[in-house]
Regions:
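Surface-exposed, charge/polar-rich loops and edge strands
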Residues: 46, 51, 56-61, 69-73, ...
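Short, basic, glycine/proline-bearing loop/turn elements
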Residues: 35-37, 67-71
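Short polar/charged helix/loop
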Residues: 78
Length: 136
């Protein structure tokens, strides 16, 4: 639904495609028809979809996770794909969509873990990064 609305409103949409162990790239899609089953059966852009450039300051990256804390630390799915991809591109906007039950008091973090700047739940917007405090 988010993807379809973004495409309908004229946004450029890039989605991840797994390229090997702990490696992924983002590729532009023009419609949901550009998606095919990929790694672990998750839909990803087909091989015909052009590769997107590295994220920049105005890029919004929606990061998945099992649980999050209010400092932006997330428990992912164990592959480190997003942490590896975003290494060196921390200036982009990193957000997560979650249910309020996914917000934990504290999530243990490793030095290589990339934090999210904000979390949107069905109940609130949690601003985790000092750079976005004025949004509240």
């Amino acid at each position: 639904m988010i993807i379809e609305e973004a495409l309908r409103s004229g946004k450029r949409v890039a989605l991840p495609r797994v390229r090997g162990k702990r490696r992924m790239e983002f590729c532009f899609i023009k419609s949901p028809a550009d998606l095919k089953p990929g790694f672990m059966g998750i839909k990803e852009p087909g091989p015909w979809c052009p590769k997107a450039p590295a994220p920049f300051k105005e890029s919004l990256v929606l990061m998945p996770g099992i649980a999050f804390d209010r400092n932006g630390t997330r428990a992912g799915y164990g592959g480190g794909y997003y942490d590896t991809y975003l290494e060196g591109h921390a200036e982009c906007i990193k957000a997560a969509l979650a249910y309020s039950v996914q917000i934990a008091p504290e999530i243990p973090a490793a030095p290589a873990d990339i934090k999210v700047d904000m979390i949107v739940t069905e109940k609130e917007l949690i601003i985790c990064s000092q750079d976005f405090r004025e949004i509240r």
